[in-house]
Amino acid sequence: ALQTLAVKMWTGKQVTTPYDSFNEQRNLLSEAPGVNQLGRIGKAPGLVYEQAAVTPNRTLPYREIGYNYLVSFDIKGADEAKGTELFRSPDAVFYLSDPISGMLGFARDGYLNTFNYRIMPGEHATVGISGDNRVTRLHINGKIVEELNIQKRFYNGGKDSMNYVRTLVFPLQETGNFKSQITNLKVYRQ
């Protein structure tokens, strides 16, 4: 949206490109030299990164992937301590076992969001996390099992409310100290 606002605020005169065409073309622009706040990987939708095996305590080539993504991997679960991280970046953490309940989850901006799903020791599964600017989804073996979408939260004795948006720019920079076997990591830009 920033590109659209910039055009309107700079001049807004003699706009000859229809909005739909402009909106499509603006996504091809970079944010600024050396900046990637949107977490873009690759130029087009499709598979943008893959790794046969993910090992603990490693640095990966990308910091994160931004909205409209799918990250999938195969897992053979092990007994993970609460707080076990799978991936992290400076902005977020994705947990194999969150620090409170031991479920799959993620933390960002000081908030912990958990899925109602735990990887059990010995369990074989294909896990997928997909996200956009409104919702983060958990896929298990190709099926969506939970969606963390916008919640209305009330405060001031219920008189006021705000929307809590449970989204995630998926962290990829570093792997955690986990025991489970993680293979077939695939990152898609959708």
Where are these regions (language model features)?
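Beta-strand-rich interaction surfaces with strong enrichment in secreted/lumenal proteins
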Residues: 58-63, 113-119, 157, 171-173
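Short, aromatic/His-centered strand-loop micro-motif at the edge of beta-sheets
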Residues: 105-126
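Extracellular glycan-recognition modules
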Residues: 46-105
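Flexible glycan-contacting loops in extracellular carbohydrate-active proteins
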Residues: 146-184
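Short tryptophan-centered beta-strand motifs in secreted/extracellular beta-sheet-rich domains
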Residues: 71-73, 123-140
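Short strand-turn-strand beta-turns centered on an Asx-Gly dipeptide
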Residues: 109, 139-146
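Flexible, acidic glycine-rich loops studded with aromatic residues
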Residues: 1-56
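Short solvent-exposed strand-capping/beta-turn motif centered on an Asx-Ser/Thr pair
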Residues: 76-80, 134, 177
